[in-house]
Amino acid sequence: MAEFFPSLTQCALVAAAFKVLLFPAYKSTDFEVHRNWLAITHSLPVQDWYYEKTSEWTLDYPPFFAGLEWLLSKVAFFVDPAMLQLGNLNYDSWQTIYFQRSSVIFLELMLVYALNRYIKSVPAPSKHLAHAASLSILLSPGLLIIDHIHFQYNGFLYGILILSIVLARKQSTLLYSGVTFAILLCLKHIYLYLSLAYFVYLLRAYCLDPNSVFRPRFGNIIKLGIGVTSVFAAAFGPFVYWGQLNQIKERLFPFSRGLCHAYWAPNIWAMYSFVDRVLIPVAPRLGLPIKADALTSVTRGLVGDTSFAILPEVKKEHTFALTLFFQLLPLLKLWLQPNWDNFVGSITLCAYAAFLFGWHVHEKAILLIILPFSLLALKDLRYLGAFRPLAVAGHVSLFPLLFTAAEFPVKTVYTVLWLVLFLFTFERLAPVPARPRVFLLDRFSLLYDTVSIPLIVYCSLVHGWLFGGRMEFLPLMFTSSYAALGVVGSWVGFMVVYFTS
């Protein structure tokens, strides 16, 4: 890869140096969450991990991630043993901060490795496109904001996802793709949203004869079954033996939470909530009944606290049915045409469906769409046209995660520079499509991108000057609703591109 400048390695080193400078930056409660998990896995036997509740930040990730925390705790002991004490809540010595921040950067090497494998897997004429897409992922503002300031380990996890996607490119490594994805599911269960795409693709491309779906390849079925079963047995087997599977299920899937998170993720339910809010003042004139008990608690994201003042209530069953329906649509094409591009497209559309229609979706889950889509964004200008509003909306929607003044220049300047650099570069690199571009989608993207600037200025600066500490939810609602429009518009655009390609 020496012919490309800057190289992936060079960018990774510069990015790591920049991230070290952010060590003293704002950190969210997720920092304490992971410190507490270090303490749990270090201090207690394995069978007690999912029962410990000294802190409110209980262990709610699958066993492999708990095992990763256990490994990190062995190193943490030599850095500052105090961070591993269960009762030492909200402990954040500088040694603890530096260790946990460094662990995020170190584990992100998985992403660098996966992107390097991705570039190597692409045919020579398209390697420059893969290189550009890989740099956009490595330098993603989303990963910078969520992992290196807010604090999480998404770079490591998405590295495993991308590696699994790359392994699915060749028939000879399809088995390893399925096993790698199984490992990912045992690290973080949010990737279950993508599991149907993997199931259909592996079934169609690996387990069944390419010339006839009625001729199964029994050898491949057995190998895949043994591989995937072995992974899940290693992760959950001990807990099944101890009779703790139900306890793990309660921790991993806390369905008592409300429809929307405290800050509305930019999805269909954010738009639904916005319409409900807008209808409240005009409801008496329209003769619409108002639920008085919902006026002060509309979708604040608290446990059991999801209610609408005007519009009908949304139940878990509704969100599940909508998510499943809109995931099945792209899977039909994947079943009929099981190639790698359709596989990545179906992963992206499954992520869209889960994000747009899912129950209690976090805004951080937008990366589940952006990063896989990045692998297809440069296929041609039609794909890029659908990607542009997603890139803008997805990254702007993350701004409320960092609400302190010190981080405002970092998140704003870095994100704007990334958008300008990569979207303009992508526009020059993306091939002209064989089919004509969608005129309305192009105009929508241009108008949508333009509106983002005044929105950022208002929400970050003007609102505080006008209202002080009042109406604090207004800029959040504007940001979420604006971003939701972009994500939905991008989804519709990509659905058109996917089914007409």
Curated annotation (Swiss-Prot):
It comes from the Eukaryota. Dolichyl pyrophosphate Glc1Man9GlcNAc2 alpha-1,3-glucosyltransferase that operates in the biosynthetic pathway of dolichol-linked oligosaccharides, the glycan precursors employed in protein asparagine (N)-glycosylation. The assembly of dolichol-linked oligosaccharides begins on the cytosolic side of the endoplasmic reticulum membrane and finishes in its lumen. The sequential addition of sugars to dolichol pyrophosphate produces dolichol-linked oligosaccharides containing fourteen sugars, including two GlcNAcs, nine mannoses and three glucoses. Disulfide bonds: none annotated. It catalyses: an alpha-D-Glc-(1->3)-alpha-D-Man-(1->2)-alpha-D-Man-(1->2)-alpha-D-Man-(1->3)-[alpha-D-Man-(1->2)-alpha-D-Man-(1->3)-[alpha-D-Man-(1->2)-alpha-D-Man-(1->6)]-alpha-D-Man-(1->6)]-beta-D-Man-(1->4)-beta-D-GlcNAc-(1->4)-alpha-D-GlcNAc-diphospho-di-trans,poly-cis-dolichol + a di-trans,poly-cis-dolichyl beta-D-glucosyl phosphate = an alpha-D-Glc-(1->3)-alpha-D-Glc-(1->3)-alpha-D-Man-(1->2)-alpha-D-Man-(1->2)-alpha-D-Man-(1->3)-[alpha-D-Man-(1->2)-alpha-D-Man-(1->3)-[alpha-D-Man-(1->2)-alpha-D-Man-(1->6)]-alpha-D-Man-(1->6)]-beta-D-Man-(1->4)-beta-D-GlcNAc-(1->4)-alpha-D-GlcNAc-diphospho-di-trans,poly-cis-dolichol + a di-trans,poly-cis-dolichyl phosphate + H(+). Belongs to the ALG6/ALG8 glucosyltransferase family. This is Dolichyl pyrophosphate Glc1Man9GlcNAc2 alpha-1,3-glucosyltransferase. It comes from Coccidioides immitis (strain RS). Residues 1-3, 85-142, 204-220, 276-319, 361-364, 411-412, 468-476 are lumenal. The chain crosses the membrane at residues 4-24, 64-84, 143-163, 183-203, 221-241, 253-275, 320-340, 343-360, 365-387, 390-410, 413-433, 447-467, 477-497. Pathway: Protein modification; protein glycosylation. GO terms for biological process: dolichol-linked oligosaccharide biosynthetic process; protein N-linked glycosylation. Keywords: Endoplasmic reticulum, Glycosyltransferase, Membrane, Transferase, Transmembrane, Transmembrane helix. The keyword tRNA processing does not apply. It is a multi-pass membrane protein. Its EC number is 2.4.1.265. Residues 25-63, 164-182, 242-252, 341-342, 388-389, 434-446, 498-501 are cytoplasmic. It is found in: Endoplasmic reticulum membrane. InterPro entries: Glyco_trans_ALG6/ALG8. It is an enzyme of class 2 (transferase). Its main location: endoplasmic reticulum. GO terms for cellular component: endoplasmic reticulum membrane. GO terms for molecular function: dolichyl pyrophosphate Glc1Man9GlcNAc2 alpha-1,3-glucosyltransferase activity.
